């Protein structure tokens, strides 16, 4: 038994020595090679990030674009964007399935409808339903703010829920208001606040906490909402916050 243990220890050392030799051969040896490796790693990371983000961008930015430029009802905009998102998810699912099953051509096309029905549709429906109906209490400053969540415009709810997936520290400090709320906050009454319910019955604005979150986080969240088609403004009312609204 001792002889076996000795041989195993020797084999382990030889394997480690061979691994270190191969690593030295494969590892970049010059600054130019390290720079090239870093560039390839960055490109790979960006590709992965783009692949992950694309369905959410299609859903959120697509619904806002259709709503604003197509002059369509909000639920129609959500439905069309969800359909397009389902197409993206189906394409991903087909690609993954073909990689594992080695089915291509007509065999790959035969996967489209089953994967659309049993993978893409449930995922998109679940995500939209979750985003539109649920807000965790940890992301609302108070119970009244959370209670107002379903009164917020559906497109803003989709955008908020998607932002929360990435930034788990987002805190909504205000949603719907009444005219007399401004007096209680020591502010002049606003006649055209987007925090009021609009003619369509929805609240078109929310405020997000910025205190204690850091400049980069706040800037990233503001950039996200702006790129998704929302108006954003960082201002001081009763407290420093980020105002996000849908026109």
Predicted regions and their residues:
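N-terminal targeting leaders characterized by basic, low-complexity, disordered sequences
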Residues: 1-84
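Active-site acidic/histidine clusters and adjacent loop/turn architecture
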Residues: 118-172
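N-terminal post-signal-peptidase region of extra-cytosolic proteins
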Residues: 147-159, 187-195, 229
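Active-site-adjacent substructure of cysteine-protease-like catalytic cores
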Residues: 167-202
């Amino acid at each position: 038994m001792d002889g076996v243990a000795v041989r195993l220890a020797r084999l382990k050392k030889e394997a480690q020595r061979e691994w270190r030799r191969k690593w030295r051969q494969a590892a970049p040896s010059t600054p130019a090679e390290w720079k090239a490796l870093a560039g390839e790693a960055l490109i790979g990371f960006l590709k992965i990030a783009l692949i992950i983000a694309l369905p959410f961008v299609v859903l959120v930015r697509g619904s806002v674009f259709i709503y604003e430029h197509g002059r369509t009802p909000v639920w129609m905009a959500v439905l069309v964007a969800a359909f397009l998102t389902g197409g993206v998810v189906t394409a991903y699912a087909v690609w993954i399935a073909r990689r594992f099953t080695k089915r291509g051509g007509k065999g790959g096309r035969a996967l489209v409808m089953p994967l659309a029905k049993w993978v893409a549709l449930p995922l998109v429906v679940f995500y939209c339903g979750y985003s539109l109906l649920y807000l965790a209490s940890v992301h609302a400053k108070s119970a009244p703010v959370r209670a107002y969540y379903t009164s917020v415009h559906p497109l803003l709810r989709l955008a908020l829920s998607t932002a929360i997936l990435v930034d788990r520290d987002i805190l909504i400090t205000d949603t719907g208001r009444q005219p007399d709320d401004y007096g209680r906050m020591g502010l002049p009454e606003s006649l055209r606040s987007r925090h009021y319910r609009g003619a369509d019955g929805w609240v078109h604005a929310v405020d997000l906490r910025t205190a204690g979150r850091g400049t980069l986080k706040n800037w990233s969240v503001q950039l996200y909402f702006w790129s998704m088609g929302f108006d954003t403004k960082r201002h001081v009312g009763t407290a420093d916050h980020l105002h996000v609204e849908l026109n």
